[in-house]
Amino acid sequence: MCEPGFARRREEVTGLNRITEKGLKDICKRDKLYQTPRLNDVLYLHFQGYQCIENLDEYTELKSLWLESNAISEIQNLTKLTKLKCLYLQNNLITKMENLEFNRELDTLNLSQNHIRKIENIGTDILPVLNTLNITSNYLTDSASLAALVECKTLSVLDLSNNRIDDILIVKIFEQMPSLKVLVLQGNPVVSRLPQYRKTLILACKELTYLDSRPVFPRDRACAEAWKREGYEGERKEVQRWNRAERRKTRESVNSTIRMRNRHLKPENQVPLLTSSDSEEEQKGISSAEKAQKRAEMEYGSVDTMWDEVSGESQASEHSTTSSTSAEDNESAGSQADHIAERISNRRVKPLEGRPKVLYDEAASGDVDSIVKLVTNKEENEQKDQNISEIEEQHKGKIVFIEEMNENQNASMGNQKAVSEAVETIGKPVAVDVNNTLSNSIVEPVNEQNNLASDQMEHLKGKRILIEKVDDIDPIKKELKYFDEAMQNKELKQTSELEELRDFTENLSSDVQEQAKDPSESDEEPTEEEMEVKSQLLKEQFQDRKQRLKEAIEERKTMQKNLEARKEDLNKSYNLFAKIMDDATDNVPKRVFGAGCDMPSKDWDKEECMQQLPLTSMEDSINGRPSSNDEDILTRPLTELTSAEAAEEICSQLDRKLAGEEAALRQLLCDLENENEILYSIETQIKYAESISVEDSQSQMVCASLLNDLISDVIYKDITEMGPNSYPLGPIESDEEYTYSEEPKLEKMVPPHLENPAGGKSLRECVDTFKEFFASKGNDKPRQESHTHLEKIRAAKALLKSKSLAEFSKDTPESLDAQLAKDEDRRKRHVAASAGRCFAKREKYDDTLEVVDNRLMVVKKDTGELEELPPPPELISDSESEKEVEEDDDAYDTAEETLQEYPRVPWTTPYKPKPRKAAEHLVNEAMQRILAEQFSELPDDTKENEPQEDEFFSLEAKETFGNLDSEFFQKLDLDKVTTANNAEAATECMRSYNELKACMKSGSTELQLTSEENEMLQEMLSSNEDLEAKHKSNDDPLVERDNELLNKMMQRMKEHEERARELQEQLEKEKEEENSGPIKLSMGEGSMLYQRWSPLSLTEIIDPQAEEGGRQAEEGGAQQEEGGAQSEERDDQAEGVPQAEEGVTQGEESVLQEEETHAENGVAQAEGRVLQSPEIYPIIGYEDIDDDDAASDFTTDYSSDDEVAVVVPPKISPAMLKAYYYDGFEEDMRMVRENEARTRRGLRAIMQKEKQMWKDNEEMAADMAPSPSPKEEHIPEVKTETETAKPTVETAKDKWAKIASRLNEFLDPEAMEQLESHEFGESDGEDDVDLTGLQNYDEESETECESALKETAEIGDSEKQENKTQDETLDPKDTEAITDVTLGIQRLKRQKLICQWEKIIPEDSKIGDGPTEKFLDQKAQDNPETTDERPENPKNFITLDYFVDTEPSESLEDTEATETPEVSTEQTLKTEQMEFNLDVLNDDGDVVIKEVTVEAQVTYQ
């Protein structure tokens, strides 16, 4: 359901409106707001089509204003809205942010979908509480357009999406916005250009909570900060930490729920809590267990962790992390110890992880030493097993013995004694095992020694664990004796073991180069007390082992020295290679820092190690020895330094290198400066010496004079060529001396290179040129090494004697300033006069002058193209300029104005014909036609000058002669008329055509020519006879037949004219009577003028190549004139003797009018042929009879006093015109004189033919005076008028057909298509209606009527074709004038002609049996080609005319009033309804068939 104001609202939206007080109140009423403006706090003005903001001063309490989707281009008139908080201006045409100083409470501003290129005027000083800014879909591009955001300290929401921002420096702007929380940048190129876009913006904006389409969570910010600190690895760890925290939080919430449930459940039914390795408690337990395990391993001599670091294995290997994977594995250390002991006992089965393979694969190598060691180890193992078994047996015996003892005495010390005894018994073989192992492994490499040491620690740990299991052993008496001593030994041993472990750990964590050092080197020698054993055998073995250990230690020291020497050699080679690499690359290696983390190279993973340079293999290649195994290459650390230290070392080397280069450059610059100082001192000395010598002489004056001359020329040229900014029209050249046409080619007295020495050069260029000239002159002659004072004096005297010295020295600054002022004043007057004159004559210029890019350009009127101005005139000499100063400024107005040689189109002002000047017209016409004959290879059109001036005698006659006629030529050339002026072009063409005929009237009794004109006419006639004889010699049979037909017409025309001269006085009286009578010749406004051409002109026009249709038209015109003459004889006979004189008068009048119309028709068709014929012959005609009562077409109406000579539109190309008019003045004048002579000869021939024609006309008029026939007494006099009406229509149609035949040359295809589908036009059958009037003539004129009807039928066919062409070519807009003319003729025919023919035809007459129908049938049989164009049944003609229907009764009453009683009218006008279907396109473009009923008057005959 529509709102009441919906219609009004729709009207407001349709167009652009303005905000008015009434409109605002209507909107408030529609939106149910207050009618009092100050009571409203919101106002909805969106989608209203407003152009500007206005009339809102009374709405002072507004807090929200909606102005979106309008056409607002400027923010204005908001000064009174001081409480405004929200302003919505999206979808408008705003280009600048301004005029918001008074809206200090503005919180939200929406300017999206506008044309803003820069953010401005919204800082905190202007809008202190601005919180939200939406400026999407604008034209923001870089950081400069966003720089004003730094001043918005309170802005928290910023939407910049869908702009054109591509500058990554905007991040710096966002960093300086302290309150920015929401930022939208999507849709800008910078999003893809900014690396790590989201992390970068999160780090830049500390308060950012929402970026683009996603929020910024604390987790995102924490990950971004971790990424900034530690790279991607730190970000990964941070993500894991947040994931654990989230899982812990979820688990705690679930456990709290479980605890709440378990409170109300029995213990056996309670649900266990969720546990995970990620919980902090479990992590703490794992970490504490790991710490305890490491502490125990340190105490008991385990070095697994240290070995992991040395071997490159990760600390998360199985053997070190099995206890950390779950809490259950960390319950007890005993089970793990048992597992290790078992694996130690079965080492041969599978080697332990982290141990070197050499310990287990020695037998595979087949080495004798390894086999010996394996055998020795086997024996030692057997001995250890035997000792263990003995100890177990001793334990059993001890247990039995203890049972027999007094339990009370030993109860207090059972466990301690057992432990001490176990230590004494078990420690001895362990020590021996250690010694044996060390003695056998002295010859092994450093790595193997370390492995063995770690293996020994494993044995110690295993034995220690076994001792802890012995809890049930009770001390015996012997053991109790040594209890105190054993405790002391135990303490000492533990201390020594801890020290050994500490020292060994330090050795293992040292550098790679110190790996060869014996880990037991710093071990203290065991004390005698510690090493003392009870067994003598063991004691001896211990001593032996001890001795071997000492030897091994000494040998190890020697090996260490050798290793250090070797290390030094390697360091030298490494340094040499590094130097070579630095010299080759001169850059820091790309992979110095190892996986992006600053850690020792020994902690790098295998992949990182593989990516480094294989220094070990390089070392091997340098030393010439084979490389070690692959695992050493991958696991051995590459450098002893961390990556940071390595980078610092490399940077320091580069700094030293750069410092050396910088020092070298500084030295080089110092040397160059010293050389420059030396050269400068030498040059200054030379210059000083030269200046002294110049001052001594007087040559300075000569140089100064030359420079002053050049400077004055340059300054004057700069002034004269000043740009057009200072003056409205710029430097327009003088029309008095210079034109835009080509200058005459004259030989210049001064060579071009000397004509203007300072042309186009600035002051600096002139000075440089003078310096080059001076230097070249000095270089031509080698300077003498020394100049004596005598030579200087001679040179000074020679300079003083120079002639130009006095002239140069007389100039003073004051005189030069006065000269410059005079030149400036003269230039201003020159420019002002030229500009004023040009502006005063601006109507004559086709083109306009406009300032484009600080230059004055010529803008073409028809095409709009820009062209450069012609070159300005040369500099005016001082003598000429002084004369111009004395002349009056108005003297420029007398200059002859000339036009540019550009294509022209008619102005939009109405065309006004000029008064005819007969002599000039004839001279120019003859000249143009002779020229056209000479240029027969060009297009077959002629040109004629518009007689604008009396004479063309001036110094620049050729330019004037060409330019004055260019406008008239363009008006006549239809090819150059643009499609925008089609109607105007058609009107201009018709006017020109009628002006031509008005100028060449041929019906007056005598030619009112002057003596000069008669002479020229005689010359033109003589030349015309020559041309006619030449033309007849080249005719073919077809042309001869046409000439015969035309000769017959000429004979009849001569008879008519002879008779017309005798009855001229009676004709004048008849005209007066006809003007006062009820039936007039005048057809009212819109009809054509009746004009007649002489037979001579028609004969001369005929072209051998003319079309057949044109010949038929001419033959029809001649034969219809014959028919008109014979019908006039019948009129005379019908009147009888008493009415003979009147019949003669009326018959003569009808004959003359018919002849006029047929001649006019022939002229139109002949002229149409002239437009297309390849050759042109002169057309010389007579003045037409201007009938004041003759109706004229409204397209050719003009004052009868104005007559202008107009010729056929020319087609001569502009290049040929230019070549003809501008080749030379003398040649032009010579051709003019020749053309004048030819014109005089042609005029004389025409005058002779004119006299003969009048004589023949008098004889013909005398022959046509017999008495009328009584059979035709009942035919009224209006018959002659009716006969005259048909040629009138034919003449108009011929004229328009001529135009229509050429309209397709300048109409676009769309207009032609519209014209083809046009519905209205002239009827093709109206000529047949007129033909029927000729069928009732008497049988006496049957022979003459047959020939007339034959040609008339051919004319009708040709007219049908012409009408068809006209309908197909004319545009509906262009045919409005044609339609009016056609309707006027048809209305006249309907009202007069048709009804009057009804009175002529008798009731009992049989139309189909007349001689005319018989002739038509016979002609149709003879000519089957033309039969197709005629109706099948010629006896029933039906013609449809488009007209405004009038009542048939009225026309019948009028005809009955004038009808004689003897004649009964036949009802031939009927109004019938006709139904037919039309295919019509609807609005959607679909074809719809509609049934249409039309009522029309149909004439049946």
From Swiss-Prot:
Keywords linked to the UniProt accession: Cell projection, Cilium, Leucine-rich repeat, Repeat
Keyword Secreted in annotation: no
Chaperone in keyword set: no
Comp. bias regions, Low complexity: 313-327, 1115-1126
PANTHER family recorded: LEUCINE-RICH REPEAT-CONTAINING PROTEIN 46 (PTHR45973:SF9), PROTEIN PHOSPHATASE 1 REGULATORY SUBUNIT SDS22-RELATED (PTHR45973)
Function: Cilium-specific protein required for cilia structures.
Protein name in UniProt: Dynein axonemal assembly factor 1 homolog
Organism: Drosophila persimilis
Gene of this entry: dtr
